C-alpha cells in the first residue's frame, strides 16, 4: 500500500548561557555551541563520543556572537576551596562545590496519520498527541559529578492500520529472519491504549581526574559527527544502565621534544538492554548486554580534521559475557561460543574549515563477516553490509551588525542491504538471528533515527539571531526498502504465466515519507550574568 506522509512540526523551548556550559545532546544550546565551533569561535569538547557530561563548552566572555546577551544557563558556586585545598588528586577537578539546574524542556507533537519522531530519547511519537518533559540538576565536587535529569513521556497512541506482525505480539514488526520472533524488536504500535513512561534520562554519577573519567548511569551516547542519523549510537532510544571509562579529549605532546601531535579520545562501556513489552512471550531473553569502544584522533598537522572508529557488540545477558567487552581476536566469533553476537563497527572523518565556516563529514558502517574472510572477501566485494552517512554544514553571515547568521545542513544516509545478499538471504543492518531483538532497546533502534534498511536525504537552514533561532527542514526517506528486497530475493522478476510482476506488486508500493518542518527557539535575555555565580 503506497502512502506518503507529510509532517509539520514546531517546538518551543525554554532554555537557560553561559560562558562555561554543559549541555544535553541535540538541545538548542548544544546545537548553537556547535554552530559557534563551525565558525572557529569555540573548540568542541568531544571528538567522537559524547554525552551530556562530556558536552562541556568553554566560550570566552569576550567572544561576540548572536546569543552573547542571552541567559543560556548558569553554574552556581556553592563552596570554593581552591585556596585552601591543593593536591594532585584535585588537579584539573572542581575544587569546591558547584551546581547547575537544567530545563525544564517541554516538547510537544501531533501526528495526524502515523507514528513519526526521531532522536527523542524515551519518547515514542505515535499517532495523535505526544509530549516529553525533562528537567534536572547537576552537582560537582572534587572530581565527583552527580547528575539527575530524568525524562517523562506520554503518547496518545491512536489507532492506525498496521501490517501483520512477525512476532508473538500482534503489534510487532512486520518482517524478520525466517521463523517467528527472529530479527528485531521494533513494535509498529505500543499496544492499543495511551501510555506514560518514566525514563532516567541523562542521570549518572561520575568521577573525573584531569581527563580520565569513569561513570555509571543512563546518559545517552552520541557517536560520530552525524546530525540526524548516527550509524551506531544516538539518543533515539530510551536510555539504559551502563558503566563507562576512558579518556576525554586530550592533547598529546611528545615528552622532552615538546611536540604537539594532536588530540586523542577513547571510551569503553558496557550496558544492559531491555526488550519491549510487544515482542515475544519468552521472559528468559528479555535482556541483552551491549559493549562499546570509541576511538578518535585529531592530528595537529591537519587543522580541523578528526578521524574516528567505533565498535559495538551485543551478546546475551550473562555476567560471563563481560569478557567480550575487549575486541581481541578470540572475541570476534562470539556466537560460536554460545553467547550470541551482533558486532558492528563504523569509521569515518570529520573536517572543519573554520576560516570559511565549512564542515564535511562521513561515516561508514559494517556488520557481519564478509564471505571468504579478510582481505579476499573485501577485495571481491567491499560493499558487503556497508551503510553510510555523509554530510555538509556551512555557516553564513547575514548581518554582523544585527548579529544574524545562517547555517545550511545537508545529510545523506543509506542503510539498505548490499546487493550481494540478493544471492544469499534477506538482511537488515538492524536485525539479528541470535540477538533476536536486533539493534534495539525497549523497542526502538539505538541509532539511525529514520530506521535501518532505507535511505534519507535531509536539508535544513537555520537562522540565528539575538532572540533565538528559526529553522526550516525539508527531507524525504524510504524507511525500510530491505523489506521489498527480502520479498524479491527468492522470487522471479516477471512471470506472465503465473501473473507475477514484482515491479507492480512491490516496487510501486514502496513507502516514501516527505518532511517539511519549521521550528522556532526563543531565548530570554533577562539579567545576564557570568557563567559562575557565587552564592
Language model features with spans:
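Carboxylate/His-rich catalytic cores and anion/metal-binding grooves
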Residues: 139-178, 301-305
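Extracellular/periplasm-exposed beta-strand and loop segments of Gram-negative cell-envelope proteins
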Residues: 122-126, 136, 159-164, 181-193, ...
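Short loop/turn motifs that connect adjacent beta-strands in outer-membrane beta-barrel proteins
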Residues: 23-24, 95, 139-143, 208-211, ...
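Sequence/structural signature of outer-membrane beta-barrel proteins
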Residues: 117-121, 155-157, 187-188, 212, ...
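N-terminal periplasmic/intermembrane-space "pro-region" immediately following the signal or transit peptide
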Residues: 20-129, 135-142
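Surface-exposed coil loops of outer-membrane beta-barrel proteins
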Residues: 170-191, 195-196, 219-298, 310-339, ...
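Bacterial Sec-dependent N-terminal signal peptides
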Residues: 1-25
Amino acid at each position: 500500500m503506497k502512502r506518503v506522509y507529510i509532517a509539520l512540526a514546531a517546538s518551543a523551548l525554554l532554555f537557560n548561557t553561559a560562558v562555561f556550559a554543559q549541555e544535553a545532546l541535540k538541545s538548542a544550546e548544544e546545537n548553537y555551541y556547535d554552530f559557534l565551533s563551525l565558525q572557529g569561535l569555540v573548540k568542541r569538547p568531544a571528538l567522537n563520543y559524547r554525552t551530556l557530561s562530556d558536552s562541556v563548552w568553554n566560550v570566552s566572555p569576550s567572544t561576540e556572537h548572536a546569543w552573547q546577551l542571552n541567559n543560556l544557563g548558569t553554574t552556581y558556586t556553592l563552596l570554593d576551596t581552591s585556596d585552601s585545598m591543593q593536591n594532585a588528586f584535585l588537579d584539573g577537578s572542581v575544587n569546591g562545590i558547584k551546581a547547575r539546574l537544567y530545563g525544564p524542556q517541554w516538547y510537544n507533537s501531533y501526528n495526524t496519520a502515523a507514528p513519526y519522531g526521531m532522536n527523542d530519547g524515551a519518547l515514542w511519537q505515535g499517532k495523535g498527541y505526544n509530549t516529553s518533559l525533562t528537567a534536572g540538576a547537576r552537582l560537582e565536587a572534587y572530581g565527583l559529578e552527580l547528575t539527575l535529569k530524568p525524562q517523562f513521556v506520554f503518547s496518545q497512541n491512536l489507532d492506525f492500520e498496521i501490517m501483520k506482525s512477525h512476532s508473538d505480539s500482534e503489534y510487532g514488526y512486520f518482517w524478520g529472519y525466517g521463523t517467528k520472533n527472529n530479527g528485531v524488536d521494533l513494535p509498529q504500535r505500543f499496544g492499543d491504549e495511551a501510555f506514560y513512561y518514566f525514563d532516567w534520562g541523562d542521570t549518572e554519577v561520575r568521577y573525573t581526574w584531569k581527563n580520565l573519567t569513569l561513570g555509571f548511569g543512563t546518559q545517552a551516547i552520541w557517536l560520530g559527527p552525524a546530525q540526524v542519523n548516527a550509524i551506531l549510537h544516538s539518543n533515539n532510544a530510551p536510555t539504559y544502565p551502563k558503566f563507562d571509562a576512558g579518556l576525554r579529549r586530550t592533547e598529546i605532546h611528545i615528552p622532552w621534544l615538546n611536540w604537539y601531535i594532536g588530540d586523542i579520545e577513547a571510551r569503553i562501556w558496557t550496558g544492559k538492554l531491555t526488550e519491549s513489552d510487544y515482542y515475544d512471550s519468552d521472559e528468559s531473553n528479555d535482556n541483552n548486554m551491549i559493549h562499546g569502544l570509541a576511538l578518535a584522533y585529531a592530528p595537529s598537522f591537519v587543522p580541523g580534521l578528526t578521524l574516528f572508529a567505533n565498535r559495538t557488540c551485543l551478546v546475551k545477558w550473562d555476567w560471563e559475557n563481560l569478557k567480550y567487552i575487549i575486541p581481541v581476536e578470540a572475541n570476534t566469533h562470539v556466537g560460536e561460543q554460545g553467547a550470541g553476537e551482533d558486532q558492528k563497527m563504523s569509521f569515518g572523518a570529520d573536517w572543519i574549515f573554520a576560516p570559511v565556516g565549512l564542515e564535511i563529514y562521513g561515516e561508514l558502517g559494517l556488520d557481519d563477516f564478509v564471505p571468504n574472510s579478510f582481505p579476499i572477501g573485501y577485495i571481491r566485494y567491499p560493499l558487503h553490509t556497508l551503510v553510510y552517512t555523509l554530510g555538509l554544514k556551512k555557516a553564513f553571515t547575514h548581518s554582523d551588525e544585527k548579529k544574524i547568521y545562517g547555517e545550511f545542513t545537508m545529510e545523506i544516509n543509506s542503510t539498505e542491504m548490499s546487493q550481494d545478499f540478493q544471492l544469499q538471504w534477506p538482511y537488515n543492518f538492524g536485525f539479528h538471528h541470535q540477538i533476536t531483538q536486533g539493534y534495539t532497546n525497549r523497542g526502538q533502534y539505538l541509532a539511525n533515527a529514520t530506521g535501518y534498511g532505507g535511505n534519507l536525504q535531509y536539508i535544513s537552514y537555520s537562522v540565528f539571531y539575538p532572540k533565538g533561532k528559526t529553522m526550516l527542514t525539508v527531507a524525504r526517506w524510504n524507511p525500510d526498502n530491505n523489506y521489498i528486497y527480502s520479498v524479491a530475493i527468492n522470487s522471479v522478476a516477471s512471470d506472465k504465466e503465473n501473473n507475477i510482476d514484482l515491479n507492480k506488486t512491490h516496487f510501486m508500493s514502496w513507502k516514501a515519507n516527505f518532511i517539511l518542518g519549521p521550528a522556532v527557539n526563543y531565548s530570554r535575555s533577562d539579567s545576564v550574568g557570568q557563567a559562575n555565580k557565587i552564592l
